[in-house]
Curated annotation (Swiss-Prot):
It comes from Prochlorococcus marinus (strain MIT 9215). It is found in: Cytoplasm. The keyword Nucleotide-binding applies. Transmembrane segments: none annotated. It catalyses: 7-phospho-2-dehydro-3-deoxy-D-arabino-heptonate = 3-dehydroquinate + phosphate. NAD(+) binds at T134, T135, K147, K156. This is 3-dehydroquinate synthase. InterPro entries: Dehydroquinate_synthase, DHQ_synth_AroB, DHQ_synth_fam, DHQS/DOIS_N, DHQS_C. Zn(2+) binds at E189, H254, H271. The keyword Amino-acid biosynthesis applies. GO terms for cellular component: cytoplasm. Pathway: Metabolic intermediate biosynthesis; chorismate biosynthesis; chorismate from D-erythrose 4-phosphate and phosphoenolpyruvate: step 2/7. Its EC number is 4.2.3.4. GO terms for biological process: amino acid biosynthetic process; aromatic amino acid family biosynthetic process; chorismate biosynthetic process.
Amino acid sequence: MNKRKILVPLGEKSYEVTLEAGILNNISEELLKIGITKKRKILVISNEEISNLYGKKFLNNLKDNKFQAKMFLIKAGESYKNLKTLSEIYDVAFEFGLDRNSIIIALGGGIVGDVSGFAAATWLRGIEYIQIPTTLLSMVDSSVGGKTGVNHPKGKNLIGAFNQPKAVFIDPETLKSLPKREFSAGMAEVIKYGVIRDKELFEYLEIDKNKNELINLKNEYLIKIINSSIKTKSHVVSQDEHENGVRAILNYGHSFGHVIENLCGYGKFLHGEAISIGMNIAGKIAIEKGLWSKEELERQRVLLESYDLPTEIPKINKEDVLTILMGDKKVRDGKMRFILPKEIGAVDIYDDVEDSLFLKFFS
Protein backbone atom coordinates (compact mmCIF):
# COMPACT_ATOMS: atom_id res chain seq x y z
CA MET A 1 0.00 0.00 0.00
CA ASN A 2 1.39 3.36 -1.03
CA LYS A 3 2.38 5.82 1.65
CA ARG A 4 0.45 9.11 1.63
CA LYS A 5 1.91 12.29 3.08
CA ILE A 6 -0.19 15.37 3.76
CA LEU A 7 1.47 18.65 4.73
CA VAL A 8 -0.20 20.88 7.31
CA PRO A 9 1.38 24.22 6.28
CA LEU A 10 1.76 26.47 9.32
CA GLY A 11 5.09 28.21 8.73
CA GLU A 12 7.60 27.20 11.41
CA LYS A 13 4.95 24.93 12.95
CA SER A 14 4.32 22.95 9.74
CA TYR A 15 4.26 19.16 9.98
CA GLU A 16 3.40 16.10 7.95
CA VAL A 17 0.67 13.53 8.39
CA THR A 18 1.91 10.14 7.18
CA LEU A 19 -0.78 7.66 6.24
CA GLU A 20 0.18 4.04 5.54
CA ALA A 21 -1.15 0.59 6.38
CA GLY A 22 1.32 -1.16 8.70
CA ILE A 23 3.32 1.97 9.60
CA LEU A 24 3.17 1.11 13.32
CA ASN A 25 5.44 -1.87 12.66
CA ASN A 26 8.21 0.51 11.50
CA ILE A 27 7.71 3.30 14.03
CA SER A 28 11.35 3.47 15.17
CA GLU A 29 12.47 4.00 11.59
CA GLU A 30 9.84 6.72 11.10
CA LEU A 31 10.93 8.54 14.28
CA LEU A 32 14.57 8.58 13.18
CA LYS A 33 13.50 10.05 9.81
CA ILE A 34 11.94 13.07 11.53
CA GLY A 35 14.94 13.67 13.77
CA ILE A 36 13.93 11.91 16.98
CA THR A 37 17.32 10.69 18.18
CA LYS A 38 17.82 7.83 20.63
CA LYS A 39 19.18 10.27 23.24
CA ARG A 40 15.71 11.75 23.70
CA LYS A 41 13.36 10.24 26.27
CA ILE A 42 9.96 9.21 24.95
CA LEU A 43 6.84 9.04 27.12
CA VAL A 44 4.11 7.07 25.34
CA ILE A 45 0.62 7.83 26.64
CA SER A 46 -2.14 5.34 25.89
CA ASN A 47 -4.93 3.43 27.62
CA GLU A 48 -5.25 -0.18 28.71
CA GLU A 49 -7.33 -1.35 25.76
CA ILE A 50 -4.96 0.14 23.17
CA SER A 51 -1.96 -1.08 25.14
CA ASN A 52 -3.24 -4.66 24.99
CA LEU A 53 -3.85 -4.38 21.24
CA TYR A 54 -0.75 -2.48 20.06
CA GLY A 55 0.93 -0.69 22.94
CA LYS A 56 3.19 -3.44 24.26
CA LYS A 57 4.41 -4.30 20.76
CA PHE A 58 4.86 -0.57 20.05
CA LEU A 59 6.91 -0.02 23.23
CA ASN A 60 9.03 -3.11 22.55
CA ASN A 61 9.74 -1.83 19.03
CA LEU A 62 11.11 1.40 20.53
CA LYS A 63 13.15 -0.37 23.21
CA ASP A 64 14.52 -2.98 20.77
CA ASN A 65 15.80 -0.07 18.69
CA LYS A 66 17.48 1.44 21.78
CA PHE A 67 15.03 4.30 22.38
CA GLN A 68 14.58 5.36 26.03
CA ALA A 69 10.84 4.84 26.24
CA LYS A 70 8.22 4.47 28.96
CA MET A 71 4.47 3.95 28.66
CA PHE A 72 1.81 5.46 30.90
CA LEU A 73 -1.81 4.31 30.66
CA ILE A 74 -4.65 6.70 31.39
CA LYS A 75 -8.20 5.51 32.09
CA ALA A 76 -10.47 5.31 29.05
CA GLY A 77 -13.58 7.46 28.76
CA GLU A 78 -14.63 11.11 28.50
CA SER A 79 -15.08 11.35 32.29
CA TYR A 80 -11.31 10.86 32.72
CA LYS A 81 -10.39 13.68 30.33
CA ASN A 82 -9.76 15.99 33.28
CA LEU A 83 -7.18 17.80 35.41
CA LYS A 84 -6.69 14.78 37.67
CA THR A 85 -5.51 12.66 34.72
CA LEU A 86 -3.28 15.54 33.60
CA SER A 87 -1.72 15.71 37.06
CA GLU A 88 -1.00 11.97 36.96
CA ILE A 89 0.84 12.47 33.65
CA TYR A 90 2.93 15.27 35.22
CA ASP A 91 3.87 12.93 38.10
CA VAL A 92 5.06 10.26 35.66
CA ALA A 93 6.89 12.85 33.55
CA PHE A 94 8.75 14.05 36.65
CA GLU A 95 9.66 10.54 37.81
CA PHE A 96 10.83 9.55 34.32
CA GLY A 97 12.96 12.70 34.05
CA LEU A 98 11.21 14.17 31.00
CA ASP A 99 13.25 17.24 30.02
CA ARG A 100 12.76 19.89 27.34
CA ASN A 101 14.41 17.67 24.73
CA SER A 102 12.05 14.78 25.51
CA ILE A 103 8.94 13.91 23.53
CA ILE A 104 5.45 12.64 24.26
CA ILE A 105 3.73 10.19 21.90
CA ALA A 106 -0.07 9.93 22.04
CA LEU A 107 -1.09 6.40 21.03
CA GLY A 108 -4.87 6.10 21.09
CA GLY A 109 -8.12 7.86 20.30
CA GLY A 110 -9.18 11.47 20.69
CA ILE A 111 -9.14 11.54 24.48
CA VAL A 112 -5.58 10.20 24.65
CA GLY A 113 -4.52 12.70 21.97
CA ASP A 114 -6.21 15.72 23.57
CA VAL A 115 -4.83 15.05 27.06
CA SER A 116 -1.33 14.12 25.80
CA GLY A 117 -1.12 17.21 23.60
CA PHE A 118 -2.09 19.47 26.50
CA ALA A 119 0.38 17.72 28.81
CA ALA A 120 3.08 18.38 26.19
CA ALA A 121 2.00 22.03 25.85
CA THR A 122 2.30 22.63 29.58
CA TRP A 123 5.12 20.38 30.82
CA LEU A 124 8.24 22.57 31.25
CA ARG A 125 6.32 25.27 29.31
CA GLY A 126 6.12 23.02 26.28
CA ILE A 127 7.80 19.94 24.79
CA GLU A 128 7.26 18.25 21.43
CA TYR A 129 4.67 15.54 20.90
CA ILE A 130 3.54 13.15 18.17
CA GLN A 131 0.01 11.98 17.43
CA ILE A 132 -0.63 8.32 16.53
CA PRO A 133 -4.44 8.10 16.38
CA THR A 134 -6.04 4.64 16.51
CA THR A 135 -9.74 5.49 15.98
CA LEU A 136 -11.35 6.82 12.81
CA LEU A 137 -12.62 9.91 14.63
CA SER A 138 -9.18 10.84 15.93
CA MET A 139 -7.54 10.09 12.56
CA VAL A 140 -9.74 12.48 10.60
CA ASP A 141 -10.31 15.10 13.27
CA SER A 142 -8.62 15.54 16.63
CA SER A 143 -5.08 14.39 15.73
CA VAL A 144 -4.67 17.18 13.15
CA GLY A 145 -4.90 20.90 13.90
CA GLY A 146 -3.35 21.26 17.33
CA LYS A 147 -6.42 21.52 19.55
CA THR A 148 -5.55 20.00 22.92
CA GLY A 149 -7.17 20.13 26.33
CA VAL A 150 -9.27 18.63 29.08
CA ASN A 151 -12.87 19.01 30.22
CA HIS A 152 -14.16 21.06 33.14
CA PRO A 153 -17.32 20.15 35.10
CA LYS A 154 -18.96 23.16 33.40
CA GLY A 155 -18.20 22.03 29.85
CA LYS A 156 -16.07 20.23 27.28
CA ASN A 157 -12.54 21.37 26.41
CA LEU A 158 -12.78 24.56 28.48
CA ILE A 159 -9.14 24.12 29.59
CA GLY A 160 -6.69 23.73 26.72
CA ALA A 161 -4.20 25.14 24.27
CA PHE A 162 -3.44 25.22 20.57
CA ASN A 163 -0.35 23.01 20.32
CA GLN A 164 0.63 21.57 16.94
CA PRO A 165 2.23 18.10 16.94
CA LYS A 166 5.67 17.45 15.47
CA ALA A 167 4.15 14.75 13.27
CA VAL A 168 1.11 12.51 12.87
CA PHE A 169 1.33 8.83 11.89
CA ILE A 170 -1.84 7.01 10.84
CA ASP A 171 -2.12 3.25 10.39
CA PRO A 172 -5.57 2.18 9.11
CA GLU A 173 -4.80 -1.36 10.29
CA THR A 174 -5.68 -0.20 13.82
CA LEU A 175 -9.30 0.25 12.70
CA LYS A 176 -9.63 -3.53 12.30
CA SER A 177 -10.01 -3.89 16.07
CA LEU A 178 -12.25 -0.84 16.52
CA PRO A 179 -15.78 -1.62 17.76
CA LYS A 180 -18.35 -1.07 14.99
CA ARG A 181 -20.09 1.67 16.98
CA GLU A 182 -16.79 3.59 17.31
CA PHE A 183 -16.20 3.28 13.56
CA SER A 184 -19.67 4.69 12.85
CA ALA A 185 -18.99 7.57 15.24
CA GLY A 186 -15.87 8.42 13.23
CA MET A 187 -17.89 8.41 10.01
CA ALA A 188 -19.91 11.36 11.37
CA GLU A 189 -16.78 13.54 11.13
CA VAL A 190 -16.00 12.21 7.63
CA ILE A 191 -19.54 13.04 6.48
CA LYS A 192 -19.12 16.47 8.10
CA TYR A 193 -16.18 17.22 5.77
CA GLY A 194 -18.38 16.27 2.83
CA VAL A 195 -21.09 18.72 3.90
CA ILE A 196 -18.80 21.65 4.74
CA ARG A 197 -16.22 21.55 1.93
CA ASP A 198 -16.10 18.36 -0.16
CA LYS A 199 -19.15 17.52 -2.26
CA GLU A 200 -17.16 14.84 -4.09
CA LEU A 201 -16.42 13.04 -0.79
CA PHE A 202 -20.10 13.24 0.19
CA GLU A 203 -21.14 11.67 -3.11
CA TYR A 204 -18.42 9.00 -2.78
CA LEU A 205 -19.82 8.04 0.63
CA GLU A 206 -23.35 7.72 -0.83
CA ILE A 207 -22.30 4.99 -3.31
CA ASP A 208 -23.34 1.56 -2.01
CA LYS A 209 -20.16 -0.22 -3.16
CA ASN A 210 -17.93 2.29 -1.36
CA LYS A 211 -20.14 2.08 1.72
CA ASN A 212 -19.82 -1.71 1.83
CA GLU A 213 -16.04 -1.65 1.37
CA LEU A 214 -15.68 0.97 4.12
CA ILE A 215 -17.87 -0.98 6.53
CA ASN A 216 -15.71 -4.04 5.73
CA LEU A 217 -12.61 -1.93 6.54
CA LYS A 218 -10.81 -2.27 3.20
CA ASN A 219 -7.57 -0.27 3.52
CA GLU A 220 -7.74 1.25 0.03
CA TYR A 221 -11.16 2.78 0.75
CA LEU A 222 -10.25 3.83 4.30
CA ILE A 223 -7.11 5.59 3.06
CA LYS A 224 -9.18 7.46 0.44
CA ILE A 225 -11.65 8.93 2.97
CA ILE A 226 -9.01 9.62 5.66
CA ASN A 227 -6.79 11.34 3.08
CA SER A 228 -9.68 13.50 1.78
CA SER A 229 -10.80 14.45 5.29
CA ILE A 230 -7.31 15.45 6.45
CA LYS A 231 -6.67 17.48 3.28
CA THR A 232 -9.82 19.50 3.99
CA LYS A 233 -8.90 20.00 7.63
CA SER A 234 -5.29 20.91 6.77
CA HIS A 235 -6.46 23.51 4.24
CA VAL A 236 -8.83 25.13 6.74
CA VAL A 237 -6.38 25.05 9.67
CA SER A 238 -3.59 26.57 7.55
CA GLN A 239 -5.86 29.57 6.89
CA ASP A 240 -6.93 30.04 10.52
CA GLU A 241 -4.88 28.16 13.12
CA HIS A 242 -6.49 29.67 16.21
CA GLU A 243 -10.12 29.60 15.08
CA ASN A 244 -10.65 33.33 14.73
CA GLY A 245 -12.58 32.94 11.49
CA VAL A 246 -13.00 30.22 8.87
CA ARG A 247 -11.77 27.37 11.10
CA ALA A 248 -15.08 27.56 12.94
CA ILE A 249 -16.71 25.75 9.99
CA LEU A 250 -15.01 22.56 11.23
CA ASN A 251 -17.43 22.78 14.17
CA TYR A 252 -20.45 22.03 11.97
CA GLY A 253 -22.84 20.03 14.18
CA HIS A 254 -20.63 20.52 17.23
CA SER A 255 -22.49 23.25 19.15
CA PHE A 256 -25.62 21.14 19.44
CA GLY A 257 -23.54 17.98 19.66
CA HIS A 258 -21.85 19.30 22.80
CA VAL A 259 -25.25 20.25 24.24
CA ILE A 260 -26.48 16.68 23.72
CA GLU A 261 -23.31 15.14 25.20
CA ASN A 262 -23.50 17.42 28.22
CA LEU A 263 -27.22 17.20 28.99
CA CYS A 264 -27.62 13.49 28.24
CA GLY A 265 -24.53 12.75 30.33
CA TYR A 266 -21.11 11.99 28.84
CA GLY A 267 -21.21 8.36 27.81
CA LYS A 268 -24.81 8.04 26.60
CA PHE A 269 -23.78 9.18 23.12
CA LEU A 270 -20.33 8.82 21.61
CA HIS A 271 -18.90 12.14 20.38
CA GLY A 272 -19.53 11.30 16.72
CA GLU A 273 -23.10 10.21 17.47
CA ALA A 274 -23.83 13.52 19.19
CA ILE A 275 -22.28 15.40 16.23
CA SER A 276 -24.53 13.44 13.86
CA ILE A 277 -27.62 14.65 15.76
CA GLY A 278 -26.11 18.16 15.86
CA MET A 279 -25.69 18.13 12.07
CA ASN A 280 -29.36 17.18 11.71
CA ILE A 281 -30.38 20.11 13.94
CA ALA A 282 -28.13 22.53 12.00
CA GLY A 283 -29.65 21.24 8.76
CA LYS A 284 -33.18 21.86 10.07
CA ILE A 285 -32.24 25.43 11.09
CA ALA A 286 -30.80 25.98 7.59
CA ILE A 287 -34.19 25.05 6.10
CA GLU A 288 -35.97 27.47 8.48
CA LYS A 289 -33.61 30.23 7.27
CA GLY A 290 -34.10 29.28 3.61
CA LEU A 291 -30.43 28.38 3.14
CA TRP A 292 -30.79 24.90 1.64
CA SER A 293 -33.48 22.47 0.53
CA LYS A 294 -35.42 19.68 2.25
CA GLU A 295 -33.91 17.31 -0.32
CA GLU A 296 -30.38 18.20 0.85
CA LEU A 297 -31.35 17.73 4.51
CA GLU A 298 -32.82 14.34 3.58
CA ARG A 299 -29.61 13.32 1.76
CA GLN A 300 -27.60 14.22 4.86
CA ARG A 301 -29.99 12.30 7.15
CA VAL A 302 -30.03 9.19 4.93
CA LEU A 303 -26.22 9.18 4.66
CA LEU A 304 -25.74 9.54 8.42
CA GLU A 305 -28.24 6.78 9.16
CA SER A 306 -26.72 4.49 6.50
CA TYR A 307 -23.55 4.45 8.64
CA ASP A 308 -25.66 3.57 11.71
CA LEU A 309 -25.59 7.08 13.16
CA PRO A 310 -28.47 8.57 15.18
CA THR A 311 -30.27 11.68 13.92
CA GLU A 312 -33.28 11.79 16.24
CA ILE A 313 -33.16 14.66 18.73
CA PRO A 314 -33.38 13.46 22.36
CA LYS A 315 -35.76 15.07 24.86
CA ILE A 316 -33.88 17.90 26.54
CA ASN A 317 -34.98 20.91 28.62
CA LYS A 318 -34.96 24.10 26.48
CA GLU A 319 -33.55 26.33 29.23
CA ASP A 320 -30.63 23.94 29.72
CA VAL A 321 -29.92 24.05 25.98
CA LEU A 322 -29.55 27.85 26.08
CA THR A 323 -27.34 27.73 29.18
CA ILE A 324 -24.91 25.28 27.55
CA LEU A 325 -24.90 27.13 24.21
CA MET A 326 -24.03 30.45 25.88
CA GLY A 327 -21.00 28.78 27.47
CA ASP A 328 -19.83 27.54 24.07
CA LYS A 329 -16.36 28.65 22.93
CA LYS A 330 -17.84 29.87 19.63
CA VAL A 331 -19.85 32.63 21.36
CA ARG A 332 -18.52 36.08 20.38
CA ASP A 333 -19.56 39.28 22.19
CA GLY A 334 -22.54 37.49 23.71
CA LYS A 335 -23.77 36.26 20.33
CA MET A 336 -24.03 32.58 19.47
CA ARG A 337 -22.49 31.64 16.13
CA PHE A 338 -23.86 28.70 14.18
CA ILE A 339 -22.34 26.82 11.27
CA LEU A 340 -25.17 26.23 8.79
CA PRO A 341 -25.14 24.53 5.37
CA LYS A 342 -25.93 26.41 2.16
CA GLU A 343 -25.60 23.31 -0.02
CA ILE A 344 -23.80 19.96 0.07
CA GLY A 345 -20.14 21.06 0.09
CA ALA A 346 -20.57 24.58 1.48
CA VAL A 347 -21.43 26.10 4.86
CA ASP A 348 -21.18 29.54 6.43
CA ILE A 349 -21.10 31.12 9.89
CA TYR A 350 -24.26 32.88 11.13
CA ASP A 351 -24.79 34.94 14.28
CA ASP A 352 -28.36 36.01 13.53
CA VAL A 353 -30.21 32.83 14.51
CA GLU A 354 -33.15 33.56 16.84
CA ASP A 355 -33.41 31.31 19.90
CA SER A 356 -36.95 30.33 18.92
CA LEU A 357 -35.67 28.99 15.60
CA PHE A 358 -33.77 26.13 17.19
CA LEU A 359 -35.46 25.73 20.60
CA LYS A 360 -38.58 24.41 18.90
CA PHE A 361 -36.64 21.27 17.98
CA PHE A 362 -36.20 20.45 21.67
CA SER A 363 -39.07 19.29 23.89
